[in-house]
Amino acid sequence: MYNKLQYISQGNTIEDQVRNIHQALDSGCDWIQMRFKNQTEKDSFILAEEIKLLCEKYLASFIINDNLYLAQQINADGVHLGLSDMKIDEARTILGAEKIIGGTANTFEDIQNHVKNGCNYIGLGPFRFTNTKEKLSPILGLSGYFEILQKMKKNKIEVPVYAIGGITLKDINPLMETGIHGIAVSGIITESDEKKILIQQLNEKLYANVIV
């Protein structure tokens, strides 16, 4: 099963991205999603190569946001696809059965389609408004997560669901009670001056009910 905490990278330059990702890894994060929008192919490739090496050093999983061909080119662990990106089944055909494919969802119907087409995990959101992403889908809130997770249970759909969108430390307990598997976060880690302490606190809450 996948780790419960995923860091979605931030930074407008290669240097910013590397620094932010390196700090997240060094502070205990073991799943990185590289998100480097509106960049040249060359810069995206340079960054991905560097981050792959870092993730290998820290024994962390490494997936790439939206760019399936880059993920294939550098042999990343997988890719995360948005609602307007390549279809999940097409991505599965290209990447093969072993790679991780995550899909963004805003509704129960989105999840149904993703799972049917071979998605490994769902990034469900947004939980609340966030400046990290443009063109947000409708805000879900706790009630939205509860309703969608209940529909999944009723329809016997079992796939790890990650909450995303403006999540803070105090949100984790009520979110986990809805039945999600974990969270995918950006700003809370990037902007923290005490990343090790924060990631430890996040993981303590995320894994609170896990029996080892």
UniProtKB/Swiss-Prot annotation:
Co-factor: note: Binds 1 Mg(2+) ion per subunit.
Annotated residues for binding of 2-[(2R,5Z)-2-carboxy-4-methylthiazol-5(2H)-ylidene]ethyl phosphate: 130-132, 166
Pfam family, one: TMP-TENI
Catalytic activity: 2-[(2R,5Z)-2-carboxy-4-methylthiazol-5(2H)-ylidene]ethyl phosphate + 4-amino-2-methyl-5-(diphosphooxymethyl)pyrimidine + 2 H(+) = thiamine phosphate + CO2 + diphosphate; 2-(2-carboxy-4-methylthiazol-5-yl)ethyl phosphate + 4-amino-2-methyl-5-(diphosphooxymethyl)pyrimidine + 2 H(+) = thiamine phosphate + CO2 + diphosphate; 4-methyl-5-(2-phosphooxyethyl)-thiazole + 4-amino-2-methyl-5-(diphosphooxymethyl)pyrimidine + H(+) = thiamine phosphate + diphosphate
UniProt superkingdom: Bacteria
Pathway(s) served: Cofactor biosynthesis; thiamine diphosphate biosynthesis; thiamine phosphate from 4-amino-2-methyl-5-diphosphomethylpyrimidine and 4-methyl-5-(2-phosphoethyl)-thiazole: step 1/1
Keywords linked to the UniProt accession: Magnesium, Metal-binding, Thiamine biosynthesis, Transferase
GO molecular function: magnesium ion binding; thiamine-phosphate diphosphorylase activity
GO terms of biological process kind: thiamine biosynthetic process; thiamine diphosphate biosynthetic process
Residues engaged in binding 4-amino-2-methyl-5-(diphosphooxymethyl)pyrimidine: 33-37, 65, 104, 133
Record function comment: Condenses 4-methyl-5-(beta-hydroxyethyl)thiazole monophosphate (THZ-P) and 2-methyl-4-amino-5-hydroxymethyl pyrimidine pyrophosphate (HMP-PP) to form thiamine monophosphate (TMP).
NCBIfam families membership: PRK00043.2-3, thiE
Family, similarity comment: Belongs to the thiamine-phosphate synthase family.
Protein name per UniProt: Thiamine-phosphate synthase
Organism, scientific name: Flavobacterium johnsoniae (strain ATCC 17061 / DSM 2064 / JCM 8514 / BCRC 14874 / CCUG 350202 / NBRC 14942 / NCIMB 11054 / UW101) (Cytophaga johnsonae)
